[in-house]
UniProtKB/Swiss-Prot annotation:
A Pfam family hit: vMSA
Disulfide pairings: none
Processing after translation: Isoform M is N-terminally acetylated by host at a ratio of 90%, and N-glycosylated by host at the pre-S2 region. Myristoylated.
Gene field: S
Positions annotated as glycosylated: N320
A GO biological-process term: caveolin-mediated endocytosis of virus by host cell
Bias-annotated ranges (Polar residues): 88-106
Name recorded for this polypeptide: Large envelope protein
Region of interest (Disordered), ranges: 1-20, 88-115
Keyword Glycoprotein in record: yes
Length: 400
């Protein structure tokens, strides 16, 4: 019982090849309470055991980092167990496993025929012509360098300025152009969406003004309610589909939409006429005929070059005709008057009245000023829904 036994063992400490199986007995000094060196001496008397010298080094253990009891006892009577700390030099790893640190030498570049075989197909003339391209020179030659073929060695210390100005790859796309290319459409889309939302409120505002004419001095209430389709009190501009006034609301808004489209069409025609794109040639003073072609066919204007469009006066003679520069609004008004007078003969009876009205121009201006002063606030409430259309008209006037 007192010697070493080689029969199989069971339980803790079966693997005898593992040094110090319990993990905290550096010198294998078991306490007598455990029956050391008596009934179970297998570990202390095993001649094949690994003495494991690293177990004598004090380190992080069960008692915390670097904690050593002040006396022996459970850790034995080694110097470390007595609280005597010894500095143990760290054994460096073998050279075979040591990692190489620092910058590795740059490998030798492969020959041009291997890295760029397509370049070998160029002749010397084409190759040198390609090198003259500023984009190619910027890739391979430093700023201010020469193309003599002599390559200066790179300095040991990289300059901050040269690292910024040097180009190591393909030219970077100008981010300012990319930003402006994205911001432009986004701003146009945002402005268009804002104007669209404002324009969509025009029919509702005009519908409210239209229905308010029937309720002077009172709040507008839908008159389409009856016993057959009882609905709650609501405004005539927001009738539900079950209300009999719903069809009238749709009809009013349809008429308002047609009026808005007609207004936009008139503005577009006036704009095109101002640009000289419409064959609008009114009656010429002292003549009863109009020209048959657009104003652009005129070759001899009456008053030289003018920024205003010129309209033809008579049929061309010898390839030339007489043209007069006139305001676009006057030309368009004359065109509409001629078109209407041909189809409605009774309009010719209004000509004397119009001439008399034009002759009273000072009185007309004073009357217009007085009416605007008197009806200005009420007219502003009528014109206010059309204010969002003004930016659109301005953009069309500028860019068309």
């Amino acid at each position: 019982m007192g010697g070493w036994s080689s029969k199989p063992r069971k339980g803790m400490g079966t693997n005898l090849s593992v040094p110090n199986p319990l993990g905290f007995f550096p010198d294998h000094q078991l306490d007598p309470a455990f029956g050391a060196n008596s009934n179970n001496p297998d570990w202390d008397f095993n001649p094949i055991k690994d003495h494991w010298p690293a177990a004598n080094q004090v380190g992080v253990g069960a008692f915390g980092p670097g904690f050593t009891p002040p006396h022996g006892g459970i850790l034995g009577w080694s110097p470390q167990a007595q609280g005597i700390l010894t500095t143990v030099s760290t054994i460096p790893p073998p050279a075979s496993t040591n990692r190489q640190s620092g910058r590795q030498p740059t490998p030798i570049s492969p020959p041009l025929r291997d890295s760029h075989p397509q370049a070998m197909q160029w002749n010397s003339t084409a190759f040198h012509q390609t090198l003259q391209d500023p984009r190619v020179r910027g890739l391979y030659l430093p700023a201010g360098g020469s193309s003599s073929g002599t390559v200066n060695p790179a300095p040991n210390i990289a300059s901050h300025i040269s690292s910024i100005s040097a180009r190591t790859g393909d030219p970077v796309t100008n981010m300012e152009n990319i930003t402006s290319g994205f911001l432009g459409p986004l701003l146009v889309l945002q402005a268009g969406f804002f104007l669209l939302t404002r324009i969509l409120t025009i029919p509702q505002s005009l519908d409210s003004w239209w229905t308010s004419l029937n309720f002077l001095g009172g709040s507008p209430v839908c008159l389409g309610q009856n016993s057959q389709s009882p609905t709650s009190n609501h405004s005539p501009t927001s009738c539900p589909p079950i209300c009999p006034g719903y069809r009238w609301m749709c009809l009013r808004r349809f008429i308002i939409f047609l009026f808005i489209l007609l207004l936009c069409l008139i503005f577009l025609l006036v704009l095109l006429d101002y640009q000289g794109m419409l064959p609008v040639c009114p009656l010429i003073p002292g003549s009863t005929t109009t020209s048959t072609g657009p104003c652009k066919t005129c070759t001899t204007p009456a008053q030289g070059n003018s920024m205003f469009p010129s309209c033809c006066c008579t049929k061309p003679t010898d390839g030339n005709c007489t043209c007069i520069p006139i305001p676009s609004s006057w030309a368009f008004a004359k065109f509409l008057w001629e078109w209407a007078s041909v189809r409605f003969s009774w309009l010719s009876l209004l000509v004397p009245f119009v001439q008399w009205f034009v002759g009273l121009s000072p009185t007309v201006w004073l009357s217009a000023i007085w009416m605007m002063w008197y009806w200005g606030p009420s007219l502003y409430s009528i014109v206010r829904p059309f204010i969002p259309l003004l930016p659109i008209f301005f953009c069309l006037w500028v860019y068309i």
